Design a protein with these regions (language model features):
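Cys/His-enriched microdomains
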Residues: 65, 87-89, 146
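Basic, alpha-helical terminal appendages of large translation-related enzymes
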Residues: 4-9, 60-65, 75, 93
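Structured secondary-structure scaffolds
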Residues: 34, 39-43, 69, 92-209
Length: 210
């Protein structure tokens, strides 16, 4: 809004910058996928509907410290001290977090704590390097809280199929993009050829979200 652009126009500009980066690196992706792609929206709604039908999603009120730039909530102990004495700073952008409350839909991540530990034990080489694997294990062993997966305060996003007054939170919606890119929800044969024999290269600062 400050730049006189809609969210879609701003996202288009950002996507173009990423595509230019690939060209500079002489990398030609099979597909440059975005969360605004129509087939991704269809896949997200189908995926989350199944998760909802399986009883892993419920409604509750979320309250916490939110960073607009990160589009993420932080626990009190995750924020950095504010030298001005105000609200704590988010650890990435070092901007004051905002206290935020709203009714959201939640995913029962806590129910998957032991299954995740079992998966890591059965797949010791699935996450690397070792330091990052241990970091992920530490997060799980420290206890997993249920996570908010929707937002009612914005309309930029994929609408929730059973409650279109809310949209999916980007950090839940975007991760499904990996599956969409190889055919989930649109091309079953292609999806079966690729998944789960895939390798993800991610930034070390977003390990927690993944």
């Amino acid at each position: 809004e400050a730049n006189g652009r809609t969210p879609k126009e701003h996202a288009d500009l950002t996507a173009a910058r990423f595509q230019e980066t690939w060209e500079l690196l002489d990398v030609v992706p099979d597909r440059f996928i975005r969360t605004t792609d129509p087939d991704h929206a269809v896949a997200v709604r189908a995926f989350l509907q199944q998760v909802y039908d399986n009883g892993h999603i419920y409604r509750d009120t979320y309250a916490g410290w939110y960073c607009v730039a990160c589009e993420a909530y932080y626990a009190e102990d995750e924020l950095l001290p504010n030298p001005d004495g105000g609200p704590g700073l988010d650890p990435i952008h070092e901007r004051p977090a905002e206290w935020f409350e709203e009714d959201n839909w939640f995913f029962r991540l806590s129910a998957f704590e032991q299954p995740l530990l079992d998966w890591y034990a059965a797949n010791p080489d699935a996450v690397g390097p070792v330091g990052k694997r241990n970091e992920a294990l530490g997060l799980i062993k420290g206890g997993l809280d249920d996570i908010s997966i929707s937002r009612s305060s914005i309309d930029w996003g994929v609408p929730i199929p059973w409650d279109e007054s809310q949209v999916f939170y980007v950090w839940y919606d975007a991760l499904i993009n990996y599956a969409t890119a190889v055919g989930y929800g649109a091309d079953p044969d292609r999806f079966e050829r690729w998944w789960p024999s895939v390798h993800h290269i991610i930034g070390k600062d977003i390990l927690r979200f993944h």
